[in-house]
């Protein structure tokens, strides 16, 4: 099975529009995933989902759009695009919000709360599409795909996803949006948490991972739930990943600075003698897995 991955939002924390971020993009996280059976999964719903909505309507040509929206967690940058996701306001479409059982209640609350009268002109109930909420099992199967989840190290909790062909188990996309690979003392993780994460990621064709901080930035933001890019490269190497995509870019990182960060990651791979392709997520980019 082929998985097709399109990046609609790549920035972390807050939108960062402007000339200096035009290449890699300023919208917050949203990734479109199409399976070999053309099932549609939407990973997170930051501001990038607004343009995805327009694209889906154009491609659908009046036919119903059906999708699962997998939300890693309910922090603003991962849900703030929902009120501007045009297909939700049209009858005939169907969307199911998915989240880990421990997080789903908070996700539904946050989605509704960001559309209350004090902060938005219409409520969540203004949607005309069919809307559902359904918890994700740790392991489950969908239309031609299999999905596994893992808890991430992020304040309030977050969820990572491994998506594969439903029959062969390959190829594998692993999506880990908000995850702190350092600061072991700051989380109640089991002693072998990193080994377990390596096994979850093991052999992925494509790993999309939060790489928000440089080493200096990280020291000022320990406990904020994001990773140094060096730690992300090391995880990908240890797990035998084929391609690593740096994601959840720092909102103040310019295209020039992000290109330098990417080059530093590629240099680290070379110095370790590893075989790993490293990319930086850019809005509008489509990758085939």
Per-segment meaning from a language model:
Residues 1-174, 182-187, 198, 255-289:
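Binuclear metal-dependent hydrolase catalytic cores
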Residues 172, 180-277, 282:
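Cap/insert and terminal regions of metallo-dependent hydrolase folds
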Residues 177:
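Conserved beta-strand-loop-short alpha-helix elements that form
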């Amino acid at each position: 099975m082929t998985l097709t991955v399109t990046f609609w939002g790549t920035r972390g924390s807050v939108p960062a529009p402007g000339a200096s971020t035009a290449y890699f993009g300023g919208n917050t996280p949203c990734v479109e995933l199409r399976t070999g059976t053309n099932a549609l999964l939407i990973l997170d719903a930051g501001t990038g989902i607004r343009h995805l909505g327009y694209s889906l309507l154009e491609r659908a040509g009046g036919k119903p759009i059906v999708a699962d929206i997998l939300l890693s967690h309910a922090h603003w940058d991962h849900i703030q695009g929902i009120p501007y996701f045009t297909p939700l306001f049209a009858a005939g479409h169907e969307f199911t919000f998915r989240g880990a059982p421990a997080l789903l209640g908070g996700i539904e609350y946050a989605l509704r709360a960001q559309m209350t009268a004090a902060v938005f002109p219409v409520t969540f109930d203004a949607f005309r599409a069919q809307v559902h909420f359904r918890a994700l099992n740790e392991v489950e199967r969908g239309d031609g795909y299999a999905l596994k989840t893992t808890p991430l190290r992020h304040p309030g909790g977050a969820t990572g996803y491994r998506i594969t062909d439903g029959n062969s188990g390959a190829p594998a996309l692993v999506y880990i949006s908000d995850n702190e690979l350092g600061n072991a003392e700051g989380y109640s993780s089991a002693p072998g948490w990193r080994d377990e994460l390596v096994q979850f990621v093991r052999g992925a064709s494509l790993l999309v991972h939060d790489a928000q901080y440089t080493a200096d930035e990280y020291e000022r933001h320990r406990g904020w739930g994001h990773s140094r890019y060096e730690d992300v490269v090391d995880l990908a190497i240890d797990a035998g990943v084929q391609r690593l995509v740096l994601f959840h870019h720092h909102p103040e990182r310019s295209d020039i600075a992000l290109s330098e960060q990417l080059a530093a990651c590629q240099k680290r791979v070379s110095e370790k003698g590893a075989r790993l392709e490293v990319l930086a997520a850019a809005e509008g980019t489509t990758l085939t897995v």
